[in-house]
Amino acid sequence: MPGAPGSLEMGPLTFRDVTIEFSLEEWQCLDTVQQNLYRDVMLENYRNLVFLGMAVFKPDLITCLKQGKEPWNMKRHEMVTKPPVMRSHFTQDLWPDQSTKDSFQEVILRTYARCGHKNLRLRKDCKSANEGKMHKEGYNKLNQCRTATQRKIFQCNKHMKVFHKYSNRNKVRHTKKKTFKCIKCSKSFFMLSCLIRHKRIHIRQNIYKCEERGKAFKSFSTLTKHKIIHTEDKPYKYKKCGNAFKFSSTFTKHKRIHTGETPFRCEECGKAFNQSSNLTDHKRIHTGEKTYKCEECGKAFKGSSNFNAHKVIHTAEKPYKCEDCGKTFNHFSALRKHKIIHTGKKPYKREECGKAFSQSSTLRKHEIIHTGEKPYKCEECGKAFKWSSKLTVHKVVHTGEKPYKCEECGKAFSQFSTLKKHKIIHTGKKPYKCEECGKAFNSSSTLMKHKIIHTGEKPYKCEECGKAFRQSSHLTRHKAIHTGEKPYKCEECGKAFNHFSDLRRHKIIHTGKKPYKCEECGKAFSQSSTLRNHQIIHTGEKPYKCEECGKAFKWSSKLTVHKVIHTGEKPCKCEECGKAFKHFSALRKHKVIHTREKLYKCEECGKAFNNSSILAKHKIIHTGKKPYKCEECGKAFRQSSHLTRHKAIHTGEKPYKCEECGKAFSHFSALRRHKIIHTGKKPYKCEECGKAFSHFSALRRHKIIHTGEKPYKCEECGKAFKWSSKLTVHKVIHTAEKPCKCEECGKSFKHFSALRKHKVIHTREKLYKCEECVKAFNSFSALMKHKVIHTGEKPYKCEECGKAFKWSSKLTVHKVIHTGEKPCKCEECGKAFKHFSALRKHKVIHTGKKPYKCEECGKAFSQSSSLRKHEIIHSGEKPYKCEECGKAFKWLSKLTVHKVIHTAEKPCKCEECGKAFKHFSALRKHKIIHTGKKPYKCEECGKAFNDSSTLMKHKIIHTGKKPYKCAECGKAFKQSSHLTRHKAIHTGEKPYKCEECGKDFNNSSTLKKHKLIHTREKLYKCEECVKAFNNFSALMKHKIIHTGEKPYKCEECGKAFKWSSKLTEHKVIHTGEKPCKCEECDKAFKHFSALRKHKVIHTGKKPYQCDECGKAFNNSSTLTKHKIIHTGEKPYKCEECGKAFSQSSILTKHKIIHSVEKPYKCEECGKAFNQSSHLTRHKTIHTGEKPYKCEECGKAFIQCSYLIRHKTIHTREKPTNVKKVPKLLSNPHTLLDKTIHTGEKPYKCEECAKAF
């Protein structure tokens, strides 16, 4: 009832509550279809009012619409509703769903019943509006009830949502129909109002303008909200916290923070929100819908607010200016946030940690740190984030999308902020200038950080150690050192960190991902900061300069570290041993020494390290990567510091000068070491021997001498070293890399020190002179070694045999003789060596490389020392002369060996038999005779040998390997020496000349053998048959005749040979290969020796003449065989029948008669032969080939011997013309006569086996 306590007055319901108004501009945006649709909707709204029983006068707008007139210029009348005589003038078809109509009626009745009006009911029989007067009192009650129930009298059947107005919008949502379409972009909408709003985007009209700032808006309501900003009026105040707000909506949102109310719940995941807009935004995560698309760059957004914020980027408009500092912003919210900087207020405080913030949003973000919640998860890799913005940024990593492109250089970026920063490079603008030094910056934040450098102010002080910092973040990071707290733990490996950023960086190690790639060199990095640091390498920029010495650095951190050098301050002290350090990082590394803890382990080799940086450096060893390359010489380094140190070599720059003596150095560390020389101080003393040192490092090195410890071991060969530097030098041996090249002669070296020494050769400068003999040297160390010659001092004595040496290195080499140890093994052939230098020399054999070439004859060598020795041959120089007999030698070693002849001294005596030897090597070989030991056994055939080298040579027989191949003819050899000899055949070079007869030879060994002819000395005698030989190898070959041993067996046919060379020749039979081809007639041969013999046919030369009868021959071997005719000697006797032969080959052929063995079989007809030559002859029958042609008459022959016989027809020569031989007959037919007496029939027919 009116006037009752608690009754609420309410204004009358008007037609405006259910109408939509248009301005002229808005109405013009609609096409004809949309205008007609508007008329239908407005008429429907009017009918709905009448349907609900609200008797209204017909407004002019409805009249206009019914008449088809435009509504925007009509004057609207407010029509007062009458008492609730509820009436409907419309038919059932007005409602698309009968249940929807019923539900609205039920809600009205239910609402009235709650208010105590049970007699109320909906009536459909009201004749006129006058009938409603009798119910005036009832209407008032209804009006009160409607107000009490928040005016929500319409309920939706689908979701039971209640509305205070009847809503066509709600109906359309359930139908899912989008009937309103935009002509410009074809986008569809549920409601007409949404389409109208959308159309404003295309026309971009802002007709409502703010008088204060001049900013324009599209709607009057937005302008009204905007005006509140200028008033500063905040009428909505919350009593609990005192916060005031300009808008009631903001006030309501804020209240929920205190109450914790989250009424808006997501049906998909159950998550609840304070605001419906947050729920709407959240729902798009599930749907992935991005309805707002930017026409400029194509980027899509889920919410209109984000879309509007984004659009400002393209216009670059910044209408909001700060009155304090003049800085402008795109959005007012950004200006509002900025203003707090000037006030310094931080009203939002966290009770947990006491930290205060200027904005509530920042506080909210901070609170997540305490909760540890990460609700935003990446679907690609599962990585979780605290904020959605971070997830958005992260997603770009997977897509690789870079939509933001620079118009200047075409470079693309994944985020607009990065593009914005990049653009400054092209403009070169640095608007933020430092008043102190004039340095300019791109951003104000960078300027603020820079200013602290000039003030020197460090307001953030550590309470534990007193260390001060410029920024609070640095102090926070520092504090973790004292507490030891590491709250951030890695789930993969369990490692803990002080800061979350460190954990984040660490996690990338497990993923192995490196999304940040350098465009210059293609190198990839796991973090953008590391990429930025790396990029400085390419630019070479060093912006951070030291004011003391002028040295420049790429990073400020390096400059900070450097500055301590000048101050000499060491504030970080070790509590265990009292040692002080300049930097806390150095102290931290040092502390590990006391704990011995090595937490960082290499996954490749299992090696552990004290800190992660050393592990990271170590890992490069396994990858072999050397990203830092010198532009001068191309040498690459694993670390940038090494490259920096190396560069000083090329520049020759030595900025660090000693004030005492003026000596300059490339690095400050070298100068620091040098200065100690002038002070004479040696504070570091050895407790073992009392020796003092100027540096602790020198003492540490010295101590190893007493302990004998060699902690640095080579992974390749197992060799151990006392110092890491020696190991580093040693490692180069395995790589064979020679990065240091001489510009004068092009020679390369492994180490720069070697190159430096070499360069002196070109300058011929010898600064270090000996006072005794006036001899000069290139280096001080060489002079010191030389001086020992004059003193005769040999301080290094062998404990085993008492032999003394001038240098420790020589003693070390000598000691291996007694141990017999050969730790250096060749991976190719298994051969072992006592010293790595010997192994290194040996390895060259397998590579076949010979970089050292003789300028005189072009001969190449694998080692420079070999070249030097060879060059003496051409010069003929023999600088080493024997004082006893005057004999001169080319090499000092030869003179030393020779001297023993005069002294007759044989210091090396055998304890078994008393036999003495001049050299220990000879004694060592001799001793094996007494032991009878042959410890080196072949696993293939069981044969045993005295030494490993002989075994290694023997093993090649079984493997059949011939690694040394001739580039000319393709022939392969087991040993390099054999290949060297062979090569001389192609070159025809014979540098070794006999002084007696002038004969030339390919190699020195052949010359040596030849010289014995002149002396007639045959020192090596056979014990079996008393035959003597010039050399030991010839004797060894001869002995096989008596033993009958044939160790070299053919795998194809089983034939055995006494010598490997014969087996090699034999093998060609099976392969059929003929690699040696005659250039004259194209005839091919299996062996080069055969080709050489053949070539004589074309030349017609016969240089080898018999002194007895004057007959000439093509080669020396034929002459040797011929000479036996004159002597009548037949040393080769058959054991079966006693028959003797002049040549071993004839004996071999003869033996076949007794064995009846025919190992050589024809593949065509199956016929077998005793000898391969017979098989070869036989094969011509099948081929019909006659390669030997007579030049006189053109007649061709199967064999060369037939051709030779034939040629005598033309010359009329008697082939067996023999002079001065009374025992032999001049006619070949008389030789036939001799066979009659012997009964011998050596010539057998291959077809019928008849002998002649």
UniProtKB/Swiss-Prot annotation:
It comes from the Eukaryota. Pfam families: KRAB, zf-C2H2, zf-C2H2_6. InterPro entries: Ikaros_C2H2-ZF, KRAB, KRAB_dom_sf, Znf_C2H2_sf, Znf_C2H2_type. Residues 13-84 form the KRAB domain. Keywords: DNA-binding, Metal-binding, Nucleus, Repeat, Transcription, Transcription regulation, Zinc, Zinc-finger. Gene3D superfamilies: 6.10.140.140, Classic Zinc Finger. CDD domains: KRAB_A-box (cd07765). GO terms for biological process: regulation of transcription by RNA polymerase II. Its main location: nucleus. A zinc finger (C2H2-type) spans 180-202, 208-230, 236-258, 264-286, 292-314, 320-342, 348-370, 376-398, 404-426, 432-454, 460-482, 488-510, 516-538, 544-566, 572-594, 600-622, 628-650, 656-678, 684-706, 712-734, 740-762, 768-790, 796-818, 824-846, 852-874, 880-902, 908-930, 936-958, 964-986, 992-1014, 1020-1042, 1048-1070, 1076-1098, 1104-1126, 1132-1154, 1160-1182, 1188-1210. The keyword Metal-binding applies. GO terms for molecular function: DNA binding; zinc ion binding. Signal peptide: none annotated. Belongs to the krueppel C2H2-type zinc-finger protein family. This is Zinc finger protein 729. It comes from Homo sapiens (Human).
